[in-house]
Amino acid sequence: GSVALRLDKNILSKLKMPKTVISVTGSSGKGSTCNLIVDIARKQGKSVVFNDKGSNLVTGILTTLLAACNLKGELKQDILVTEIDERYTKLLFKYLKPNYVVITNITRDQPPRHGNFEIVYEEIKKALTKDMHLVLNADDPYTQKFILNSQNKYTLFGIGTNKYTYNDEKFENLNIKYCPKCNSKLLYNYYHCETLGNYYCPNCDFKRRKPLIEVTKLDYEKSFVVVNDEYKFNIPFNTLFEVYNTLAAFTIASLINLNLDEACNTISKMPVNLKIFNKYTYNDRIVYVLNNKAENATTYNQSLLFVKRNTELKTLIIGWKEISRRYNFDDLSWLYDIEFELLSNNEIDKIICIGPQAYDIATRLKYANIEEEKIVVIPLIDEAVKFIKSKTKGNIYGILNFDMVEPFNNNMKGEKSGN
């Protein structure tokens, strides 16, 4: 892709895309959503091009397109699915011309890179044209801004009330608290997480709209979802955002006229992505490994809800190797957007802080009123795991950035691993 752009900076405009083009963007969940869409379509005999081996920036996507096109620059496949970095939609949408645009969410993410999330919203908004069909989360009041005063067709997905919803606000640092139309404070019939839920404005007509695709039954313990009281499928792991990613893919399947019963079968048979979620045992203790995204408080908050949902005695390990691979910043402002206060009254034996910012994590936990005797700082992963194995109690929860997942698993399973 890089070489092709040097040879011809207009090369993207010379490629002919398939009839159906689906682009997925947002702060998190892009890759998971794309993988589901691609698997559902391929299992039903569709030929699909997907940038799973390239990056989600211009050169990575161009590499994928060039590998899939013929000598005339035509992509003859049935469907093109692209995962696109939210800041690159403005550069790519004008060439890809997606029929469907899935916007998973827009949250506080990578502050040194993005600044305020409003900047991300504005850049995606400018990239949209009126012929693009938007697929959005009905439970997210922020993404509804894309369809206010808009000519775009849109389809919504969401989750109805269930045994996991709650009525009182649990999170302080939120993306949106006020109505985007009249600036009144939004009220909620129920919450799922952060600002996700059944919201309404008391002073104007802004409210959660009825989604076309809605979860009518959700059971994390039995790992299944029922959609529209008709379609049932298993979810590969029991987190809220996995449900949302799956709903987004299921919505696309319905819009491009795939068989939804077959889609349910495909989703139910999807293997767990062990890089995102893992579960195994160590000496009769269950080990949960949750992959979180550094610089994104929302991913940590949904992990904390997962921890809080399980009421048994537990040990936590939290940390990362690098805050960012792309930028040489050690910005930790996002650490104070994570609602660690959810853990203050939970059944916790110890919380082990690891990595180069282990002491910063410990300081944040103290501000969250976690008892000081429960907080342990052990920067090196191998030493931390030895401590967990010998001096802690209860099930084990790894709330880790992706760069600590493999070292943690290797050490827990007794394999050699670097720090």
Where are these regions (language model features)?
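Residue-level signal for inorganic ion chemistry
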Residues: E83, T104, V135, N245, ...
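Glycine-rich nucleotide phosphate-binding loop and flanking beta-alpha elements
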Residues: K30, Y88, D109, P141-Y142, ...
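Phosphate-binding loop of NTP-binding sites
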Residues: G1-T161, Y166-Y178
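Short, surface-exposed acidic/glycine-rich loop or hinge patches that mediate macromolecular interfaces
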Residues: S27, S55-N56, L240, N257, ...
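A generic structural signal for short, well-ordered alpha-helical segments in conserved domains
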Residues: C34-D39, F250, A362, N409
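ATP-dependent carboxylate-amine ligase
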Residues: G1, N183, L196, C201-D205, ...
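Adenine nucleotide phosphate-binding catalytic loops in nucleotide-utilizing enzymes
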Residues: T155-T298
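Buried hydrophobic packing segments
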Residues: I37, A41, I61-L65, T246-I256, ...
